[in-house]
């Protein structure tokens, strides 16, 4: 088997995992989730921060809070993880895929500008 990624566990991680298992808080709540949310609040200076179970859930929450619905088109790079497109699809919006630059693998700004010029008013 070729591993997708090799875990890098050092420092206090073993103790943190043991704490979670000992307390029974191994999912979406508990002291470490609260500490993480507070740290994000302090770091970003926002009033609220919510930890999500995965990136897909975070994207879905973000799209929902932005008011994205079936009347919208969401632009995304064509080179992305499937969760990006799944979250957009779940919102009901249409997806417009824009190709990426060969040298950076980021969305090609020229193609984006062309798409916007031809598809928006």
Where are these regions (language model features)?
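N-terminal "arm"/small-domain region of PLP-dependent enzymes with the aminotransferase-like
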Residues: 1-26
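Active-site loop/turn elements of alpha/beta-hydrolase fold enzymes
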Residues: 79, 93, 100-102
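Active-site phosphate-binding strand-loop segment of PLP-dependent enzymes
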Residues: 103-121
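Conserved coil-to-alpha-helix start sites within the AMP-binding
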Residues: 80-85
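Phosphate-binding glycine-rich loop
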Residues: 29-73, 87-91, 97-99, 118-119
């Amino acid at each position: 088997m070729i591993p997708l990624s090799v875990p890098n566990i050092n420092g206090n991680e073993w103790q943190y995992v043991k704490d979670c298992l000992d307390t029974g808080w191994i999912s979406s709540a508990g002291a470490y989730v609260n500490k993480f949310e507070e740290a994000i609040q302090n770091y970003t200076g926002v009033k609220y921060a919510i930890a999500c179970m995965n990136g897909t859930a975070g994207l879905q929450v973000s799209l929902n809070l932005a008011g994205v619905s079936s009347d919208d088109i969401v632009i995304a790079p064509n080179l992305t993880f499937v969760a990006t497109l799944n979250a957009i699809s779940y919102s009901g919006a249409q997806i417009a895929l824009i190709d990426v630059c060969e040298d950076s693998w980021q969305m090609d700004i020229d193609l984006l500008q062309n798409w916007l010029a031809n598809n928006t008013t």
